[in-house]
Swiss-Prot record:
Record-linked Pfam families: A_deaminase
GO cellular component: cytosol
Record-given protein name: Adenosine deaminase
EC number: 3.5.4.4
Gene Ontology terms describing biological process: adenosine catabolic process; hypoxanthine salvage; inosine biosynthetic process; nucleotide metabolic process; purine ribonucleoside monophosphate biosynthetic process
Site (Important for catalytic activity): H221
InterPro entries: A/AMP_deam_AS, A_deaminase, A_deaminase_dom, Ado/ade_deaminase, Metal_Hydrolase
Co-factor binding comment: Binds 1 zinc ion per subunit.
């Protein structure tokens, strides 16, 4: 189902949600951190979703073991590098990796700005080694409150030239976007793009707020947009993209089944919706699974899957020239 003549992208992919189980074992042993299991096979149920979680917050706890072993900046650098290696193995030409530096720093009180620098270094080394093109999106973890998000923002702004966009993720119901207006004002002043997790746990009003108050150019997940036709019309008119993550939305119980997922409706309506993974290691999936298994199960035709692939590059945070160069590079391969 993947069109090999077109660039393959993943623009909603959490770096800190893609820490390999083997790396968790390795770092746990290196830093003498007690883990819930000592073999890869027995660790998997603790760090990977093996059945549907009751809600988004429960799903997010599966990420915790990955960051609990980040006891040094070198460990952060390693997982960033491995994220690019994984992207290359998946056949991705372009990836946007988003990460929450405060979340990654929390367990071992690492300097947040140091985490940002380590991630930048690891991604740069990975791109040079594996030939994947990547951009970084900084996340503010809303779950930890406004002050913690301000610390994350300050650390990200210290390396603003290496960060492409700002995102807001976490407990959407408990921490609405209205709490973070000044944070996003600073991000826009820095020249960053804006994407926001919205319409995943909360309703269409959360998406409207992300667009009107935070300046979102893209929406992460955005499944509840299907409940508001005027909103879908607005997304089309303003070319605001939806970063769809099919398997993730089932595992978080955001959507009951793939057959119920609104991605097909979005594409039929002309919304610039794309296919993405979200947290590949935690979910036990890759981008190939999303195209070959999840998308057909969600009712997408071959042409709709191809359109979602086209949309992935269309709404990527790249200049028109960079998009054209990537298309030409893939076409010539």
């Amino acid at each position: 189902m993947i069109d090999i003549t077109l660039p393959l992208t993943d623009i909603h992919r959490h770096l800190d949600g893609n820490i390999r189980a083997q790396t968790i074992l390795d770092l746990g042993r290196q830093f003498n951190i007690a883990l819930p299991a000592q073999t890869l096979e027995t660790l998997i149920p603790h760090v990977q979703v093996t059945s549907t979680e009751p809600d988004l917050v429960s799903f997010l706890t599966k990420l915790d073991w990955g960051v609990k072993v980040l006891a040094s900046l070198d460990a952060c650098r390693r997982v960033a590098f491995e994220n690019i290696e994984d992207a290359a193995r998946n056949g991705l030409h372009y990836v946007e990796l988003r990460f929450s530096p405060g979340y990654m720093a929390m367990a071992h009180q690492l300097p947040i700005a140091g985490v940002v620098e380590a991630v930048i270094d690891g991604v740069r080394d990975g791109c040079n080694t594996f030939g994947v093109e990547a951009r970084l999106i900084g996340i503010m973890s809303r779950t930890f409150g406004e002050a913690a998000c301000l610390q994350e923002l300050d650390a990200l702004l210290a390396h603003r030239e290496n960060i492409t966009a700002l995102d807001l993720a976490g407990d959407e119901l408990g921490f609405p976007g209205s709490l973070f207006l000044s944070h996003f004002n600073r991000a826009r002043d820095a020249g960053w793009h804006i994407t926001v997790h919205a319409g995943e746990a909360a309703g269409p009003e959360s998406i409207w707020q992300a667009i009107r108050e935070l300046g979102a150019e893209r929406i992460g997940h955005g499944v509840k947009a299907v409940e508001d036709r005027a909103l879908m019309d607005f997304l089309v008119q303003q070319r605001i993209g939806i970063e769809s993550c099919l398997t993730s939305n089932i595992q978080t119980s955001t959507i009951a089944s793939l057959a119920d997922h609104p991605l097909k409706t979005f594409l039929e309506h002309g919304v610039l919706a794309s296919l993405n993974t979200d947290d590949p290691a935690v979910q036990g999936v890759d981008i190939i699974h999303e195209y070959h298994v999840a998308a057909p199960a969600a009712g997408l035709s071959r042409e709709q899957i191809r359109q979602a692939q086209i949309n992935g590059l269309e709404i990527a945070f790249l200049s028109d020239g960079e998009k054209r160069a990537l298309r030409e590079k893939v076409a010539a391969a």
